[in-house]
């Protein structure tokens, strides 16, 4: 504890219930947005320079999320905002 600070002066922070990303719904959303943009899994694979389409399939099934950099690129390719891709549980208090 820093000098001059006693327990009665400590700030108490309220725990905030942050939303969490719904992996399955986000994956389904990625697939839906990809199809709406007229892109194939192979198109995304080529655009990201992946050797195989496995990462794209993992995103679409909710087995994994794109990295932040890939999420930014995905949003640009799909002509949407990042918030349009991610689906949260909406449990913000």
Q: Where does each model-flagged region fall?
A:
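The alpha-helix within a helix-turn-helix
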Residues: 34, 45, 75
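Residues within the helices of the helix-turn-helix
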Residues: 31, 42, 72
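DNA major-groove recognition helix of helix-turn-helix/homeodomain DNA-binding modules
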Residues: 69-84
